[in-house]
Amino acid sequence: MKSVGHFVPWLTDIRHLTDGTISEVFVGERKNSKKLYVIKVQGLVFKRPPHDAMRGKLILESIGHPHIERIVDSFIDNEAGSVYLITSFKSFVLSDVMDEISIDTKCKIVLQISSALEYLEKHGILHRDIHPNNILLDSMNGPAYLSDFSIAWSKQHPGEEVQELIPQIGTGHYRAIETLFGCHSYGHEVDRWTFGILIAELFSNQALFDDGSSEGWPSELRLTSSIIQTLGTPNPSMWPELSTFPDWNKFIFHEYPPKPWSEILPSVDTSIQYIVSHLVTYSNRASPSFVIESFPKVSARLSQYA
C-alpha cells in the first residue's frame, strides 16, 4: 500500500490527526511554506450507507461557495480502493469553542452557514449531517465553513440512493424528526431542522433535545420522545406528510401540548427563539433566506447586550 505522501508529494511532515466514521485524517505542511493542509483518506470498497466517499468527492468538487470547505486537490488510489481529499487546515472546530466565542462571531457564523445552505438548496444538494463538529473556523472570530460531505446527496450525484433516500442520516440528537419515522422522501427540510438546533445550542450552550448520549445509551425512541415532549405530539392535521411515514403508526404516543419557546430556551433572547421556532418545527420550516433576512435585526439587538 502506497503511503499518504506518495499521493501528496508537495506536503511534508505528514502525521495522523484523527479517525472518522469511514476515514483516516492526516495533516501535513506544504513544502517551502508553513501552510497546513488536511488529507482525508476514505475507503471506496466497504461502504457504510449513507456514507459514500466518491459521491461526497463529486459533490464537493461541484461546489463553489466562500463558506463551504473547498477541495484543494484529490486523488484516487485504485490499488487500495481509497480516495484522498485535500483541504486547507482550519484552526478550530465549532463544537470545541461554542461557549468561548463572542456573540458577534456567533451571529456571523449563523449568517455564513445560512448563505452556504441557501447555495446548497439552490443546487439541489442535501448536506444531511449539520452539527457543530462539521463547522470549521479559521480563527475564534471566524470565518466559518460547512464541512464533511461524506453523507451528502444531490440530484446530480445520488449514488445508490436513486429511487429513495436513506432515513438513517444525521448525528445524535440533531436528527430530523421525519427520519426517525422512516421517511424516504425528505428534502431540504432536514437541513433546516438541524441548522435550527445548531442555532439554538450556539446561543444557549445546552442541548435542545435528549437522545440519551450523555448517559452512554443513545436511542432513537428516546430522541423521538424528547422532541414530542418539547414540540408537542404531531398529527396529520398539522403535518399532512406524517401519515406517509412508514414508522409513524408503529407507536402510540401520549398527547403532549407544545411548550412555549420561552420555556424551551429560557436563557436565549426572544429574537433567537423566533428564528429557531421557524426552523425546528414539524411543517413549513423556514428557508435559509428567511434567516439571512431576519438576522441583521437579531445581531443589532444582541449587540446591545454584548
Curated annotation (Swiss-Prot):
- Residue positions binding ATP: L17, T18, D19, G20, T21, I22, S23, E24, V25, K40
Q: Which residues form a coiled coil?
A: none
Question: Which residue pairs form cystines in this protein?
Answer: none
Record keywords? ATP-binding, Kinase, Nucleotide-binding, Serine/threonine-protein kinase, Transferase
Magnesium listed as a keyword: no
Query: Domain Protein kinase, which positions?
Result: 11-306
Q: Where is the active site?
A: D129 (proton acceptor)
What's the protein here called? Answer: Serine/threonine-protein kinase csk1
Species of origin? Schizosaccharomyces pombe (strain 972 / ATCC 24843) (Fission yeast)
Q: Which gene encodes it?
A: csk1
